Amino acid sequence: MPSPTHKNITTQIGCHLEEVAEMLTVLKSDNPFQSMAIADTIASLVLLSDRLKAYGEDTYVREEDRAELLDALCDQIVTATGIGTFFGMNVPGALSEVNRSNYSKFVDGNPIFNENQKVMKGPDYTPPDLTPFI
């Protein structure tokens, strides 16, 4: 079982929200109110993500809420897979490729972290090729 620090946890949650914001950047609408709502949501997620990564020490999940957190994380995985499937994407294959790429960041089997505990790209890093899965 890993032993992450509180900073590691809030940084990881911030990174997760950053990825949700990134997904929303490709969501377009011809309705100006919908476009504004998307832009506002992206801005809010980016702000929260940045704050969690920099100042997350006062943010936490209560022990009694851990089951609810796990349920929400699982639901996010299921719904994210569903979105990709609806677009005809091979999400499990793409996930394997992204994992391969992420592990190529490691040096001697270990991640390299920056001062914010973000995993950095090592010298043997290769980006994921998602083309076959779209």
Task: Pin down the residues of each PLM region.
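Flexible "arm" and connector segments at domain edges
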Residues: M1-L73, I77-I134
